[in-house]
């Protein structure tokens, strides 16, 4: 086992503090509308330019192992805030830095670290409760656009695009961000339910110019088995032909004689028909077929349920206003499903998603919700160069997370104002002893840090502006972009409550652990021994001396 280096007390804490400050100083220059960029060197390709706090934090590794331990613990703050709300990483880092610095000063002055931590925790619980009281719902497009704009670094086009996407696909819809091919940002919206399965034969195509199949008011047959025998299909084909409507078959597979007969019937105009494979695999396929059944008010013909394809009737068929099938995708538009059944199915999938443990499962369940409840929107980010593209895509993703958080828990005044107000509201909070009271004061002081940093990055004097904002009331704050005081919500400077809450909670949690550190242990660096393997090589010419 390798030898260890052990440090105690102030010696350990001062090293840890140095690491915390190096990382926080690198991250906090990005905060606010006038925050600067950070350039990150990459082992291959061009450097990455970013204003995203967590991207900067992830790059920091320090040579001194004790300092690095401090930096890595602070990195956890940014990472946790990012996982919880998708934004607020820089705010969380600034809060944690302030709590650690002020807390360690108090420890050096003889305060009890455990009581300090209890005081900090008490202050945060009080502050979170007050934050929730200040929060206002964020439901209209205007406030969603404002949140998106602030998070995307005051880029109004991004905020507007996100608001437009949310309006079209709903709060449950899936919005993804991709790299575009042009200079302009674009929004593509797929309405209805779309899945990644195309037509099984090009002979089904009835729109040759678009190489697609379009079926108006079709019946939809859903089966979880392979269909290869046309005899099973004959009764339903005859019923559909009599009804004079087209038919879409979604099954595990349609092959051989069955597929050939369908193609011939379609080409002769006896019955307008198309067939596609069911989406997904295994249990997920069964679940998605059930989703389509509920969306179209149909029944999945499944032998597990005791249903037989030969005995199926038009009552078992689903229906939709329109279906469009391309080589790769099938889109069902305006299914005739019962709204209350769809919403209870959405609730059921949401519950499954909350209980799911893997991110992949959560993502797939969220996609199913989106396909049932709204649709899918794709924001295509445009930029002139690859470096700009990466930076902009990261900003758009941040803005998207922030708007989702805003819709979930509402918004509070931005620009660090909400934290100043809640710090003021817990001014009368008291702990069980004086050391806990100091902890409460440390947390309240830290709540001013984001505003002070935003002001410092804008080149103004933090103390003067912080005191003016503290003297104000409600949503009155300082707009660092325009350098004016006013109502932050009226000026469109909003922060999602969830982002502010997560930043405060994670900062206090990890900073509290750092304050209570008394000993740090790390591996001693291994000494490189000189390579002596070639030392005797020069003696070869002495062989004749004997």
UniProtKB/Swiss-Prot annotation:
List of residues binding ATP: 30-33, 51, 87-91, 415, 479-481, 495
Keywords: ATP-binding, Chaperone, Cytoplasm, Isomerase, Nucleotide-binding
PROSITE patterns: CHAPERONINS_CPN60
GO cellular component: cytoplasm
Keyword Calcium recorded: no
Top-level lineage group: Bacteria
EC id: 5.6.1.7
Protein name: Chaperonin GroEL
Organism encoding this protein: Wigglesworthia glossinidia brevipalpis
